[in-house]
Design a protein with these regions (language model features):
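Active-site-proximal loop/helix segment associated with metal-binding centers of metalloenzymes
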Residues: 31, 116-147, 159-160, 168, ...
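Zn-dependent metallo-beta-lactamase
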Residues: 1-22, 28-32, 37-38, 117, ...
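Beta-strand-turn-beta hairpins that frame and shape the catalytic cleft
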Residues: 1-4, 16-23, 106-115, 142-149, ...
C-alpha cells in the first residue's frame, strides 16, 4: 500500500492514493518574482482531475493558484477561515465547495481523513472593508491504507509538535525550512535546526523540506543527519516524486 508524494515546487505538493484520489497542498505553481519564488513544475491546468485542494493559510505563496484549480475541476477547497472569505468574495467560489477548517476539525473525503492542527503563524488578508486575521493551520492526512502525513504549512517551532507526534504518530513530515525574500534576506519561520528538531518530535520515518529558495534543502538534510539520524531525509526537486509505503 503506497501514497505517491510529488513535489511541485515551493510549498506545492500533489498526493495520490492507491484509489487514484488526487489532492494538492498549498498549490503555489505560478511563482512570484517579487518574493523570489520560481514557477513550479506544472501549470494549474494540469490538475483538472484533482479532488481536494488544501490551503494552510491565506498568504499568497500558499494559496497560490488554489482558486483557479477549484474553478477548472470538481475539487473542493479545504482551508482556514481567511482563505474561505477570499474564495467567496474574490474568486466567487460557491460556498458548498468550501470546507472551512479550524484547529481540531476533521473531515473525511473518501479514502483520506484531513485533520486541522494549529500552526504557530498568522493568516492575514486585506478585504474591501478592512482586513481579516484567522487561524493558520497544519494538516494531518490519514489514509485508508494506514499512512499518515503531517504537512506543516508555515508553522514555526512550538511544543505541540511533540504532542502531535505522541497523539497521531505521523510517518512523514513535510516542513518549511526557508522563506520569501525580504530586503535580500529570507523570512524564515522554521530554521534548519528547528525543523530537524520538529521532525524528531513528530517521530516520523521520513522528513521532506519545502518553502526554500537557496540551499536550505541540502542544509536541512545535513541537520537531520546530526540531530535525528534515524529519520530519512528526502530531498525532492520540483517535479520529482516518491512512493511511501508502510
Amino acid at each position: 500500500m503506497t501514497i505517491d508524494i510529488r513535489y511541485l515546487g515551493w510549498t506545492a505538493f500533489q498526493l495520490t492514493t492507491e484509489k487514484g484520489t488526487t489532492m494538492l497542498l498549498d498549490p503555489m505553481l505560478n511563482g512570484d518574482p517579487k518574493d523570489g519564488i520560481p514557477p513550479g513544475a506544472e501549470k494549474p491546468e494540469a490538475f483538472q482531475e484533482a479532488k481536494l485542494i488544501l490551503v494552510t493559510h491565506t498568504a499568497t505563496d500558499h494559496v497560490g493558484q488554489a482558486f483557479d484549480i477549484v474553478k477548472i475541476s470538481d475539487a473542493v477547497l479545504v482551508c482556514d477561515v481567511a482563505t474561505k472569505f477570499r474564495a467567496l468574495e474574490e474568486a466567487g467560489i460557491a460556498e458548498d465547495r468550501i470546507y472551512q477548517m479550524v484547529s481540531g476539525v476533521r473531515y473525511v473525503f473518501g479514502d483520506v481523513k484531513v485533520k486541522a492542527l494549529p500552526a504557530r503563524h498568522l493568516s492575514f488578508a486585506r478585504t474591501a472593508g478592512g482586513f481579516i486575521n484567522a487561524q493558520p493551520l497544519s494538516y494531518l492526512l490519514s489514509f485508508a491504507t494506514g499512512e499518515r502525513i503531517f504537512f506543516g504549512g508555515d508553522t514555526s517551532i512550538h511544543g505541540d509538535l511533540k504532542l502531535y507526534g505522541e497523539l497521531y504518530r505521523p510517518h512523514v513530515a513535510i516542513l518549511g525550512v526557508g522563506g520569501v525574500d525580504v530586503h535580500g534576506q529570507s523570512l524564515t519561520e522554521l530554521y534548519l535546526d528547528e525543523a530537524a528538531l520538529a521532525a524528531g518530535w513528530l517521530g516520523v520515518r521520513v522528513a521532506i523540506p519545502m518553502h526554500y529558495r537557496f540551499d536550505e534543502g541540502n542544509e536541512f538534510m545535513d541537520a537531520l543527519k546530526k540531530q535525528a539520524p534515524d529519520i530519512e531525509g528526502k530531498l525532492l526537486r520540483p517535479g520529482e516524486s516518491f512512493s511511501f509505503a508502510l
